[in-house]
């Protein structure tokens, strides 16, 4: 129904012919149809996800923030009749601003932690235990603690955990602070790069949503495994408490993109 309304209002895509096969099929596609995708993501998330989860909160803010940038871009193209849409520098400023919000939130939030195994000598800092039969290496009870950390994982490498505090090693007592600064900068780069990557991918009808659905499915698996202590330990993946809730968001995202492809 929303698609029909947009088509009646002639809010459609104008295509510059580049001679690509299937390119002209995108002509007339409702330009502001992204509003439907946003609703299809946000409504299920609000209904089924834990809204007190910091990762869900960040995803809701990111979805609305980037959706607003896309809305302004389409509005300028369609109603202001400026073919270029929102100027590139304003898009980048918006993306960098979002990256800064995400990075700083991950830094200051007490709910953003990783869980590590500890030795018996560190038993004083233990916050939880993994019962016998749940750990693949020793099949014994394992002591763990939740810590604030700048560690990340590097794919395809053995012993692949990397600590951004390494960049601050020369600064002595300020190594951890430098590590968080590097972490926030990298977060900004990732948010900006992924956002622009989606823009660059878009062009043929369904191309961006099709690839996004595949990427979303992969990230959903990783989020589930990383948020499950048993699977994370078995697969030697960093366990991040509460990150499994992201599966709800990703399921809504995949459903929205597949629904878009259907119509």
List each model region and its residues.
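P-loop potassium selectivity filter motif centered on the GYG triad
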Residues: 147-175
